[in-house]
Amino acid sequence: MKTIEVMDTTLRDGEQTPGVNYTADEKLIIAEALLRSGIDAVEVGSALISEGEADAVRRITQWARSHDALDKIEVLGFVDGTRSADWIAQNGCRTLNLLTKGSEHHCRVQLKKTPEQHLQDIERTVTYAHKNGLTVNVYLEDWSQGMRDCEDYVMALTAGLAKLPIKRVMLCDTLGVLTPHQTEEYVRKMHECFKLRFDFHGHNDYGLAVANSIFAVRAGAGRIHVAMNGLGERAGNTNLATLVVTARDLYGLSSNVNERALAMLSDLVAGISGVEPSANAPIVGRISAIQGCGVHADGDKKGKLYQNRLDPTRFGRKRSYDLGKTAGLASIEHNCKELGIEITPEQQRALLAKVKELGDQKVTVTQADIILLLHDIFSAKENGIKLLDYHFTLKKGAPPKVALQLCHDKRKFEARGEGDGQYDAFIKALRSVYADLPELVDYRIGISRKGTSGALTEATITWRTDGKLFTTRAVNPDQLVAAMNATMRMLNYIEFKRELSKAASAQT
């Protein structure tokens, strides 16, 4: 199986995503995670743009040097004589990715220079960088349109580059305009005409970045540029997870990337960048490992009839079955098994009917809700733990405080707490009563698109207990109340699950 190299540009091109800015700490965290996952090289930033960028490059190169990975760190630089090369060297990096013009139109319009003048400027920059110990790769920006509109320019420029001490020529579909077949044709021409190492740098404007990248490899490109979650300008760069898995499964092209790290990397970059992958994104999307149809759950139970090679466990995830109105008994059975509870066929049917009823009402049912629904359906006791009242004190310069009135099996009691925020105060008040609360893993607030201040918000909180994750949700116009209600569902989930376990033990 042929192995392709992968260069990740989440920290450089990915930071050009509107609204995305990384701190030096964040860049270091992401760079470490990428390199530990087997990425061949990481482009960590651009020369000269800010002192914060310089700090990030210094810290990343210091870490890389101590882990024998300095040659895997790359920085974008410009055709500016000595400035970019000096900046990169002063901040500890050894590799300059030099941005040049891959189309005559860009050369003449943006630089106001002739092709000959541009090549002379490139020669001066490359020669200086090389003499000062830097490895130089050269980006051909807008190469795709250069090949389409003036191939002679591209060939003449590349012929000039071939005489210089450069390691790679990086072919850019800057505006994402190529088809896979055009990509293959253009890359093959470059590969056949020049004895150079070629990278392909794709963009996803037409949704073809992954396909174009694979066809570039087929034509002779040895390294592909990617970004985690497809971050980048406009529609983004080639998606790391989709590229690696598609190349292996469908084209027999392996990489050094650890597939089990893909979900972790996606979550890490999403959390830091604030840009979530689409819910149904291949490999890493929130619902991409969820089967929604009861027929599919039944087929998987009987013979894995609806599973392909994209087993979620390959990527550090697990398969699950949705609890909506298209669910079936197999969906119920699977989720109960995941929760470690056994219920009778009659209870399964009653639970399925309730799930479908809620689905018709557009209510999202989580796996943890099964416990609460079973309690509502079959228990004669009043619902376990209730939040009867709450009073928050919020004053400038003082920590938020809360006084709670709770009821547990008809017994009323109070709890108080203060914290860094109102929800933190609420949690600390609960911990004063329930010391063994599960670990809060993830907290998300979603707001409807009505565009009004009174729009409903949904709190989605993920918890960990006994090594297992579960999620609770609640909806309210006030996001704090939504979060508190989701937390109360967590308390009742734990309480009712304990009751079910006791009942099952008593029967045996």
Predicted regions: what is each one?
Residues 48-67, 73-76, 80-85:
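N-terminal active-site wall of soluble small-molecule enzyme domains
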Residues 175-178, 185-301:
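Catalytic alpha/beta core domains of metabolic enzymes, predominantly
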Residues 13, 17-18, 46-52, 103-105, ...:
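Short, small-residue-enriched loops and turns at beta-alpha junctions
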